[in-house]
Swiss-Prot record:
Species assigned in the record: Aspergillus niger
Protein's recorded name: Cross-pathway control protein A
Ranges where the bZIP domain occurs: 187-245
Cellular component GO terms, alphabetical: nucleus
InterPro entries found in the cross-reference section: bZIP, bZIP_sf
GO biological process: amino acid biosynthetic process
Region spans: Basic motif: 193-211
Length: 245
């Protein structure tokens, strides 16, 4: 195959009257239109490509996209086909390529009844019985046992006035004995310091106990006043009822 000369072919391409077009463009400097440039790249690729060259069609034959490119579909179609590029890609790819052309008519990847389990009827009945509230009936009547001894007369319940929980439980307050005097060696500085700390702790504890006793007496007084106010309220309420009748 002869090497084409672009400078000589320009008069025929552009229908020029003169053949000096190539002479005007020819110069010692190598350029795109100079006959001095190597024109091997204008020849077909099959002649200059080495035997081990792989075409892009062979690279994309397995429908795998290069890792450094981005495509609209999951992969690139063959180069000899127009290809169908869309943004409605789906991970479900049929190897036979017999999918419907309308994506809305495809079968769902996650069917609603795909995870349905067959439940035992006995288990359903048991669950329904557990969810039903139990019927609440009247409380059972206590059984009164007859005894030979006469029943004690009903005595009025004692008021809470001046009554402590410890007294009802049979627990009496411990009688506190007077503490012994603090003895220490006046020649020992550590013993003197320990004695002063002990005396300060005793005074603090005594003040705390005194404060606690005052609070207990105040609570008893308030409870007594509350009980008296309740009694007065009941008295005047009963008087109002008798007056209206």
């Amino acid at each position: 195959m002869s090497t084409p000369n672009i400078a000589q072919d320009f008069p025929e391409l552009f229908d020029l009257q003169s053949n000096r077009f190539g002479d005007d463009l020819s110069s010692p400097e190598s350029n795109m239109l100079s006959p001095q440039i190597n024109t091997s790249f204008f020849s077909p690729m099959g002649e200059v490509a080495p035997p081990g060259t792989v075409s892009p069609k062979d690279l994309f034959f397995d429908a795998s996209a290069p890792p450094s490119t981005t495509f609209t579909d999951l992969s690139t179609p063959p180069l000899d086909t127009p290809g169908f590029f869309s943004q409605n890609t789906s991970p479900m790819i049929n190897t036979e390529m017999d999918l419907n052309a309308v994506p809305e008519e495809w079968e769902s990847l996650f069917p609603q009844d795909g995870f349905s389990l067959d439940l035992d009827s006995a288990a359903l009945e048991l669950a329904a019985s557990l969810q039903q509230p139990k019927a609440t009936g009247p409380p059972p009547t206590p059984v009164i046992r007859a005894s030979a001894s006469p029943a004690p007369s009903a005595s009025p319940a004692p008021s809470r006035q001046g009554t402590k929980h410890s007294t009802v439980a049979g627990v009496n307050a411990r009688q506190r004995k007077p503490l012994p005097p603090i003895k220490f060696d006046s020649a020992d500085p550590a013993a003197m310091k320990r004695a002063r700390n002990t005396e300060a702790a005793r005074k603090s504890r005594a003040r705390k106990l005194e404060r606690q006793g005052e609070m207990e007496r105040r609570i008893e007084e308030l409870e007594r006043m509350l009980e008296e106010s309740k009694q007065r309220e009941e008295y005047w309420r009963s008087m109002a009822k008798t007056g209206t009748n």
